[in-house]
Amino acid sequence: MTVTPHVGGPLEELLERSGRFFTPGEFSADLRTVTRRGGREGDVFYRDRWSHDKVVRSTHGVNCTGSCSWKIYVKDGIITWETQQTDYPSVGPDRPEYEPRGCPRGASFSWYSYSPTRVRYPYARGVLVEMYREAKTRLGDPVLAWADIQADPERRRRYQQARGKGGLVRVSWAEASEMVAAAHVHTIKTYGPDRVAGFSPIPAMSMVSHAAGSRFVELIGGVMTSFYDWYADLPVASPQVFGDQTDVPESGDWWDASYLVMWGSNVPITRTPDAHWMAEARYRGAKVVVVSPDYADNTKFADEWVRCAAGTDTALAMAMGHVILSECYVRNQVPFFVDYVRRYTDLPFLIKLEKRGDLLVPGKFLTAADIGEESENAAFKPALLDELTNTVVVPQGSLGFRFGEDGVGKWNLDLGSVVPALSVEMDKAVNGDRSAELVTLPSFDTIDGHGETVSRGVPVRRAGKHLVCTVFDLMLAHYGVARAGLPGEWPTGYHDRTQQNTPAWQESITGVPAAQAIRFAKEFARNATESGGRSMIIMGGGICHWFHSDVMYRSVLALLMLTGSMGRNGGGWAHYVGQEKVRPLTGWQTMAMATDWSRPPRQVPGASYWYAHTDQWRYDGYGADKLASPVGRGRFAGKHTMDLLTSATAMGWSPFYPQFDRSSLDVADEARAAGRDVGDYVAEQLAQHKLKLSITDPDNPVNWPRVLTVWRANLIGSSGKGGEYFLRHLLGTDSNVQSDPPTDGVHPRDVVWDSDIPEGKLDLIMSIDFRMTSTTLVSDVVLPAATWYEKSDLSSTDMHPYVHSFSPAIDPPWETRSDFDAFAAIARAFSALAKRHLGTRTDVVLTALQHDTPDEMAYPDGTERDWLATGEVPVPGRTMSKLTVVERDYTAIYDKWLTLGPLIDQFGMTTKGYTVHPFREVSELAANFGVMNSGVAVGRPAITTAKRMADVILALSGTCNGRLAVEGFLELEKRTGQRLAHLAEGSEERRITYADTQARPVPVITSPEWSGSESGGRRYAPFTINIEHLKPFHTLTGRMHFYLAHDWVEELGEQLPVYRPPLDMARLFNQPELGPTDDGLGLTVRYLTPHSKWSFHSTYQDNLYMLSLSRGGPTMWMSPGDAAKINVRDNDWVEAVNANGIYVCRAIVSHRMPEGVVFVYHVQERTVDTPRTETNGKRGGNHNALTRVRIKPSHLAGGYGQHAFAFNYLGPTGNQRDEVTVVRRRSQEVRY
């Protein structure tokens, strides 16, 4: 029997029983239970806080690449908070799921809805409003009022100099729209439409909002400036190697990798919603390697850290290539690799060797024309050597087969019975025509980066009258991989430090031990062999933002191509910098570029545009030949970068606007008055210098941009490299530029140099935003935008296969409007004013020679023919830009903006070279939306709401409309002769609508708009269609390229990947040498601006939650060693100064940082905790105050193969990683 222990006695029992009289509640008989009622009033607050009336699906349009679906909670008409959606479709068994997706930044967005930074009403610059109202009262016409202000230099300078100094006043939507419309009408009437520009980046992050504004700009004949290249997020190597902008795997494909490298991409920070795939791949057994100069957040996830000095990654990749070529191609041959490069790369193709003085140097591809073939497009059909027959043959699939009747059914990678020989060494030496020759190659591994040469032997043979070798032969010579019997300077082994591209050579440059580089290369290759190419490299801004990023990327891509990893699930490259992938591509570009109403659109590379119009070119005092190869032809001798930009514009390689030194509308009138064909008239006038390209005199007031609209962007506070030059020259307000244009440097020969440098080119800068930023603060008109929780829109990304919706959880509060509604108001006001001042005009539109068109064959061999230099009469579309005459009915802009135009019925829609015809879709849209019943748009489908525009974008895109996907593949089948339509068959009746995206995340359809397959739920990987279905790459050979044969690439010595160190800022720009300054108070360091943990670009960096989680305000990360040199302790105020500007911030001293490098995270705006400087007493700048735009000539190459312009496909990058700055400790007493 169990005895219950008894504690206490009668006294205790008495106390227990008495206690019930003093304790609230009801007691049980045994006193063991007390029941209390009430007292929970405090819970009401908690329950009320988390109660809500409805939940709405939306996402964030912040260019974070996440495109995460969120639940937005609303109570009493107020947005209260957000949480992650959890209804993503399953990716299948045996792999992790996509959900939940999100990050702390996204989870804090609702703070913005009611924050102090919210733009609630339309604003305009007070002094300008006063001028405008007075002039309008006096003249009675908005356009005349605007013209009156611009005609008075004193009044114009008054409001320009007020930019950024406060003084914004509330105005009505009607007055703001009228003022903006008047500025547009006046500019078009006086100067021409190409003096109007729009800047809005990353359409994938909110397609409707982007298209609404871009559509207006293009309909009036204005210019859309690019962003992908301007941000330096575009890896120019992608068009150079693949002929593709950037197509990359979704993050779910990382799971399939068995060797995963993060090279210049800090995945946990910049790809937070997707980082779990990286960790899970490692748990699955993949080895994870990180290449970075600092101990970054992703380093702690890695199995191995390869600590490579900043900006020297090319040297490491070249050394790894040396090992892979030695181990897998020369000492042994890995059949998997050899078979791959024979079919899918240009390694077997023949290169002509040419004499240059006493030297033998690599030249251009041997083509069918060189060996006497007279077939169509013979000059664009490169040749190779058939190993079986020992004869030179012309394989199918090259550019010459892509266009023209002879190529129908032959543009494919089917080699038939041909076995491409990788080397002429495989030749059987018929008639003794095989021998070896010394070829001279460039090298740039000196400290200052100037070129030297190395001579190495290659096996050669004759092909007709030409001495040739293969690309592979040149690769081995260039990488320093010796073969028996070949003369020249060769490494004695991996540990030879004296010869370029060996592991020991790279150690002295990168700091990576030679043994580690050798093991890294061997592991990478061995894994590819054993796994069938499942070696993957995630790449990003860490190596993409450098001046020489193209060769840096090409050297890394070479590793993937040599190991057969491209075009494989779980293998290849994975470049992520920016939310670039507009999955419904065709529909978006039709809407955004207004090609349903007028063609072609005006598009310009952003870096070229801002380089010229912010006068940053004037501060470049070095000759372009400083970058040239020692074995070049001297094409850049004595030329300034601006001369090369002028030549590229003249030859039609790269566009620039404005076009002419007078209005393009007036030029059309002149040609008509002369009774001449417009093309002939323009060419003749240009040759006689009676008409000039504006690029030859960009500082002449007639050639200035006059009106700039910025929306969905923060140009001045985020992406404006050389921000202080924007302020000084474009906007005409105060700046902190610390230098003057050099007087003793190289000045342009073909561009007017005037000692009077303009300040204040723009008549109007207008921005649309939901929060106050550095851009809105300098704008003349600020329109209040709806946030991402207050409008209808679409989002997609590279990272996952879904299309997401934005949905309005509430109506836009105060006087805010969606971008769609804002541009509707502006277009309506514009058309009303145009009735009196513009009417219908004829416009002459110049457009660069385009990628994915026959324009790629304009310049055989990529040989420049500069009519500006020779005095010849240019030929439009051949030796200069294409010329198109466009009729613009300016009175009907609003009606056209609001409807789907007839050109898609007439000409179809072309994407990446194939055309589809959406007759059925147009009829369906007309039936669903109704049609316009009057005016020029009568009978056309009405797009009167943002929801409707979203549905149009989806309906016109193969990724969201299975019928168009199948039609596109059938069209490609005719040209390729390969079966492709099966990739989308079964989807013919499938449609994705805006309502579908509101219901849940919707995966897209496999479409020829992109290079990978998603059929059957497959994880998306790029180029799988090329590899598995023999569709050629969009390049000269139809294969992936190691070798580039364009004149301007050759002049730089970059036909093959080559190590080029960071720019020598001391030699080229007279900046201080790295290290302590002469006075010992400062330290010159390399200045890098990586992406931030606490913001996406400038969004969230001013968010109260993120300011609380981070250090808050402007900061600079530096190493303890560097900090000690200038007596800086953690959290001290420091000041950074260089020729471009001044930056004031607090120091974060951390052991994770290498010496000689500082990080200022992108973006830290001037709107948070930015004090005055000690240098000049003005307020300090932002992270871009210390940067400046520099143009690399090879990025301007055009008119030949994959080197041809397309918007955001190819253009100079706004690189900024080569900068240096002097940092010093400043007074800790800061003033604001």
UniProtKB/Swiss-Prot annotation:
Biological processes per GO annotation? cellular response to decreased oxygen levels; cellular response to nitrate; cellular response to nitric oxide; nitrate assimilation; nitrate catabolic process; nitrate metabolic process
Q: How is the cofactor bound?
A: Binds 1 [4Fe-4S] cluster per subunit.
- Compartments (UniProt record): Cell membrane
User: At which positions is Mo-bis(molybdopterin guanine dinucleotide) bound?
Assistant: 233
Known regulation of its activity is: Increased nitrate reductase activity is seen under hypoxic conditions, however this seems to be due to induction of the probable nitrate/nitrite transporter narK2 rather than increased enzyme activity.
* Cellular component aspect of the GO annotation: extracellular region; membrane; nitrate reductase complex; peptidoglycan-based cell wall; plasma membrane
Residues recorded with modification N-acetylthreonine? 2
Family annotation (InterPro entries): Asp_de-COase-like_dom_sf, MopB_CT_Nitrate-R-NarG-like, MoPterin_dinucl-bd_dom, Mopterin_OxRdtase, Mopterin_OxRdtase_4Fe-4S_dom, Mopterin_OxRdtase_prok_CS, MopterinOxRdtase_cofactor_BS, NarG
Record's catalysed reaction(s): nitrate + a quinol = a quinone + nitrite + H2O
- What else does UniProt say about it? One of the activities induced in M.tuberculosis by hypoxia is the dissimilatory reduction of nitrate to nitrite, which serves to provide energy as the bacteria adapt to anaerobiosis.
Q: What is this protein called?
A: Nitrate reductase alpha subunit
